[in-house]
Amino acid sequence: MKKHNSLQRTIGMPQAIALYIGAVLGSGVLIVPGLAAEMAGPASLLAWGFMTLLILPLALSMGLLSAKFPNAGGVSHFVTLAFGPKAGALVGWFFLMSVPIGAPVAALTGAGYMTAAMGWGDPARIALAAGMLVIGLLTNWIGMQVAGKVQIAVVIAIVAVLVFSFGAALPGMERAHFTPFAPHGWMSVGQAAAILFWCFIGWEAVSHLSEEFKEPERAAVKGVTIAAIIVGVLYFLSALATVGTQSYLHGGADSSLLWIISQPLGAWGGFIAGLTGLFICTATIIAYAGAASRVAYALSRQGYAPGWMGLLSNRYQTPVGAIGFLALCFTLILSLYGSGALSITTLITFPNATFILTYIGGCAAGIRLLRGSRAGVTISFISFAATLAVFPFTGWAILYPLLITVVFAGVDYLRSGARRVGER
C-alpha cells in the first residue's frame, strides 16, 4: 500500500452528473411529495416550485468552488483556504462523522421499501442493507471510474421509474384534485418548504471527489447545473403526480408515490417500488462513501487524521485505509440497530446538524473565495442564508457536532502540547 500519493483523475462528465444526482436524489423523492401534500395540499406545489428555483444556487455554490479549487478535502479544503486549517479540518470531521451513520440509515431505508413490499422481516432488511453498503464500499475501492459507471446505470434506472410513475399518474390526474388549493392556509406552504429543503442538499458531497475529475472546471460547473435541472424536474413531476392523483390520500402520505407505481403493475408494483427504493439509496451510498473516504484521505494528508487513513491501494490508487474505517463504522451501526440498541428514528437525527454545518461552512467559504465573481458571491450568499435559516430546526441533533468539536479541540490541544514538549 502507498501513502499520500495523488488520486487518479477518472471521473468524466457523465459520471460527475450521475454522482451529483445520486448524492441529492435520495429516498425523500418517494416520501416527501406525499408528506408535503398532506401538510399544504395542492399549494405544496408552490413550495416545490420555489425550492426548484433555489436548487441552482445551492448546487452552483459547491460547483464553482469545486471547479476553482479541486481537492479531495472538498468543503474542508474550501474552509481551510478561507478560514484556516483548523476550521477546515473541523468541517472535514463534521462530514466524515456524518457518513458512518447516514449511509447505514440510507441502506436501512432502501432495504425497508423492499422488505415492506415483499413482506419480509427485519433480518432480511439488515441483510439487504449490509449488501448495499458492501456495494458502495467495493465500487469506491475499485475506483471512481467503475463507481461512476455503476452510478450512471443506477441513476438511469431511477429516472426511468420516476418518469414511468408520472406517466402512470396522468390518467388519474383531475382538475378537481387541485381544489381547494390551500386547504390548510398559506403558512402551511412555508412549513412544507422547510421540509423540502432537506431534499435539495447533498451537492457538497461530490466536492470531495473533485480532485478526481478529468476536467474540474467543466465537470463541476456544467455537471452540477445539468444534475440540478434533472433533480429539480424529477422532484416537481413527482409532486405534481402525487397532488394530481391525490395518492397521498389513497396510499398514505408516506407511500403516495409507491401507490402510484403499484397501480398499473398490480402484484409487480410493490416489487418495482421496493427495487426503486434500493436503487435510490444505493446511489446515495456510493456517492457519500466515495466522498467520506476522500475527505478522510485528505485529512490524513494534512495531519488531522491518523496516518493509516491516508493509505492508498497499490492496484487502484484509492483510499483503502479510509474505506476500511467506513467498513468498521458501518458494521458497528448495523450491529447496534440489529440488537435493538438504536432505532432508525434515533439514528436519522444524528447527521442532520453536521451535514448542515458542512454546507454552511462551504457557503461561507464561497463568499470569501469567489470575490472575483459577483455571481459567485451572490450564489454563495443565497445558499448560506438558506442553510443558516434551516439550521435551528435541527433541534437536539446539534449535540452531535458539539461532541465532535469538543473531541477535536481536545485532541488538537494534546497534539499542540506534545509538539511544544518536543521542541524543548
Residue ranges and their predicted role:
Residues 35-39, 47, 56-133, 137-141, ...:
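Hydrophobic transmembrane alpha-helices that form the core helical bundles
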Residues 77-79, 84, 116-120, 225-288, ...:
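TM-loop-TM module centered on a large, flexible mid-protein loop between adjacent transmembrane helices
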Residues 49-50, 117-144, 156-166, 199, ...:
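Transmembrane alpha-helical segments of multi-pass small-molecule transport proteins
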Residues 1-34, 38-43, 47-49, 55-56, ...:
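Membrane-interface "cap" regions at the ends of multi-pass membrane proteins
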Residues 29-33, 110, 139-145, 174, ...:
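Transmembrane helix-loop junctions in multi-pass membrane proteins
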Residues 1-4, 80, 106-129, 212-216, ...:
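Helix-loop-helix connectors at the membrane interface of multi-pass transporters/channels
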Residues 2-7, 45, 49, 118-124, ...:
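Helix-loop-helix junctions that connect adjacent transmembrane segments
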